[in-house]
């Protein structure tokens, strides 16, 4: 095959266009998100010392954390502080106020929510401290479903030289005084999300723990 000077110029121009294409840094923002919610009631003012209250194999003594055993049957609109990470392929929404969970993950190329995205927040009383919700991705430690899965967490946004961004959500577990952090990281031009974990033992004694992520997805007869 013979390449003419005109063909060579076309190839050169095309290569220049491709080389000039730059990948945009990940966008990160904090925004208000209103979601219909069935609120949890006020916690019991009396401390819970009763150990025989077995929840998923755990002892029922949760002092010094209060216990909530009431849920409202009336739905209200509640505004949450949502942390959004986004690139050209993926949008991730985290809700630090609901246990530091991934609330939604959207494939922007086809509009598909690849995690189960709730339209209504409706807790059930199956958590060690009381309220628990499904959907999205729940990060659990130091035992089974995280005791504080419905409690608000702190968060901070972290920028990296390669244009990626991480939102770190963290809390101090009141039962064994350990600290757990989960980081949700999105990279420029990449169609995947990365999770990072940091655990700290703030005591002078060894502490046992497990770590697992509980992801919810919407399925049908053709789900793979």
Residue map of PLM features:
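Extended, loop-rich substrate-binding clefts of extracytoplasmic carbohydrate-active enzymes
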Residues: 3, 48-77, 82-86, 134-192
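Acidic-aromatic substrate-binding/catalytic surfaces of carbohydrate-active enzymes
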Residues: 9-65, 82-86, 90-152
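Intrinsically disordered, low-complexity boundary segments flanking structured domains
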Residues: 10-19, 142, 153-159, 168-170, ...
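Acidic, contiguous internal or C-terminal segments within carbohydrate-active enzymes
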Residues: 72-74, 86, 92-110, 169-220
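Intrinsically disordered, low-complexity regions enriched in Ser/Pro/Gly/Gln/His and often acidic
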Residues: 125, 134, 161, 204-205
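Acidic, low-complexity intrinsically disordered regions
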Residues: 128, 137, 164, 207-208
